[in-house]
Regions:
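Glycine-rich FAD pyrophosphate-binding loop
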Residues: 42-63
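A glycine-rich dinucleotide-binding beta-alpha-beta segment and adjacent secondary-structure elements
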Residues: 207, 215, 381-465
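Glycine-rich loop(s) and the adjacent beta-strand/alpha-helix scaffold that form part
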Residues: 179, 223-293, 472, 478-481
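An anion/pyrophosphate-binding glycine-rich loop and adjacent beta-alpha core
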Residues: 269, 273, 282-381
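Glycine-rich active-site loop/strand segments that organize a redox cofactor
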Residues: 69-108
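Extreme N-terminal leader/targeting segments of oxidoreductases
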Residues: 1-24, 42, 461, 465
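N-terminal Rossmann-like FAD-binding beta1-loop-alpha1 element of flavoenzymes
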Residues: 22-49
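Conserved redox-cofactor binding core of oxidoreductases
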Residues: 107-225, 247-248, 393-412
Length: 490
């Protein structure tokens, strides 16, 4: 529920007293906010972070912890993988569109190795080991994994596959509760605190404050139910996350997510976007959404995914986020996994970070014809799909969707189907249009003076597609830029 407090900007002339003051004021203490705070402090600014909850972390601390980095990071090299900024850009432009921001992606790829080194210098630990199994994330403390379908069709023909999912090393991870994202946030917050960054908690930002020239000079927030005014002598950085939990904004901009659970935190209510919009800020890719597919990849890769017509529609060995998008956007959220008994048992016994996503078969039969009938599919629909798949699988190929040969195996008997209809949830990727220096742009195309933003409240490197790690990667990368830019203001 969005607060009913007026969102129109306040005039500084109406502020009788500033309750807090700093050179740079950062709204949000997640990955974008902490990165902005560190760089602003290193640039000599006095920094104050306003956090809505009672502690740092945001969605980042609950995330699996993937940071999308490449171009030849020390971790990639240590694990035996070659990559270059150009190769990374080729993949990202193909996978993150349509309409991907080429200037941002070029900038991000060229700065990726330096960004990895920055994280390491801030104390973020990475183990020099690669996890090569299908999965949402490494189940152990391995530091590198494929996280965007780079090694699956069609991307493995477009760019040379290289794993770019960098995960902070952490013991005792619990997916969705305390993931690798915690070990990303903890050292960064400690770095910020050593630099003298201050934080005020239970601060719900309400609106921006501008002077008579239109420059952003502060924020009005609610702290413990009381309005407080916070002055920013140099600049304000917005870093409060997406609008995944604002039903009104979802209905207006990303209606494909209506009724789908938000894969975010409830504090992601879009307030920063609305605050900046009230100043005339431009938006980009507000319809863009990531969609998670809720079935363990170790099972999915060993069967075939079919839609409500019994037809395959996606290579099963690709990134689960891509499967989710293809299912929700193009198959009316209808999906079934057809798999034989031997393959199901093999997948169920495989090591995974998400054993709780191992769905049980709903239907089982001795023949595909019986299974098809039990599922209520038109006679011959599933049979023809399996027949074509098995014909080529006998030779270890998949000319239809190009699943890699290592996962291509004829479907035998007995055979079962998992009912995965509606097994998707998502979060928003669109937001404020920003420059590579994290300046928030007015609809006129000019930067709004004194206002910067980063993270999921902005439109970053993802314009439609997604790869795990682009949120934490983009948020930290452009969070740093926001802090530097804000600190430079007079």
């Amino acid at each position: 529920m969005v607060d009913a407090t007026p969102i129109r900007p306040r005039s500084a002339a109406t502020v009788t007293k500033w309750d807090y003051e700093a050179d740079v004021v950062v709204a949000g203490y997640g990955i974008a906010g902490v990165s902005a705070a560190i760089e602003a402090a290193r640039a000599g600014a006095d920094v104050l972070v306003l956090e809505r909850t009672s502690g740092w972390g945001g969605a980042a601390a609950l995330a699996g912890g993937f940071i999308y980095l490449g171009g030849g990071t020390p971790l990639q090299k240590a694990c035996g993988f070659d990559d270059s900024p150009e190769n990374m850009k080729t993949f990202m432009m193909a996978a993150l569109g349509p309409g991907a921001d080429e200037e941002k992606i070029t900038d991000y790829c060229e700065g990726s190795v330096a960004h990895y080194n920055w994280l390491v210098d801030c104390g973020v630990p990475f183990k020099e080991s690669f996890w090569g199994e299908p999965g949402w994330e490494p189940p152990f403390d391995d530091g590198l994994m494929y996280s965007g379908g780079e090694n699956a069709a069609p991307f493995n023909e477009i760019a040379t596959p290289a794993p770019r999912g960098h995960v902070p090393q952490m013991d005792g991870k619990r997916t969705g509760e305390k993931g690798g994202g915690y070990m990303l946030m903890k050292p960064l917050v400690e770095t910020a605190e050593k630099l003298g960054v201050r934080a005020e908690y239970d601060m719900r930002v309400q609106t921006l404050v501008t002077d008579d020239t239109g420059r952003v000079v502060g924020i009005v927030a609610k702290q413990y139910g009381k309005d407080v005014a916070v002055r920013a002598r140099r600049g304000v950085v917005l870093a409060t996350g997406s609008f995944a939990y604002n039903d009104k904004m979802i209905e207006a901009h990303a209606p494909r997510l209506i009724g789908r659970p938000g894969a975010a935190i409830e504090e992601h209510d879009g307030r920063s976007i609305l605050m900046a919009q009230a100043l005339g800020a431009d938006l980009a890719h507000m319809d863009a959404t990531e969609v998670a597919f809720l079935c363990d990849p170790q099972l999915v890769v060993r069967g075939i995914l079919v839609n409500g017509r019994g037809q395959r529609y996606v290579p099963e060995d690709t990134y689960s986020g891509r499967i989710g998008q293809m299912t929700l956007f193009h198959q009316d959220n209808q999906a079934f996994l057809v798999i034989d008994e031997a393959s199901y048992e093999e997948g169920a016994a495989a090591t995974t970070a998400t054993p709780f996503l191992r769905a049980q078969p709903k239907w089982a039969a001795e023949t595909v014809e019986e299974l098809e009938s039990d599922m209520g599919l038109p006679a011959g629909a599933l049979q023809s799909t399996v027949e074509v798949y098995n014909k080529h699988a006998a030779e270890g190929s998949d000319p239809l969707l190009h699943k890699k040969s290592e996962w291509v195996k004829p479907i035998g008997s007995p055979v079962a189907a998992l009912d995965l209809r509606g097994f998707t949830l998502g979060f928003t990727l669109g937001g404020l249009r920003t420059t590579v220096n994290s300046e928030v742009l007015h609809v006129s195309g000019e930067p709004i003076p004194g206002l910067f933003a980063a993270g999921r409240c902005t439109s970053g490197v993802c314009a439609g597609g997604y790869a795990s790690g682009t949120s934490l990667g983009d948020g930290s990368f452009y969070g740093r830029r926001a802090g530097i830019s804000a600190a430079k203001q007079n």
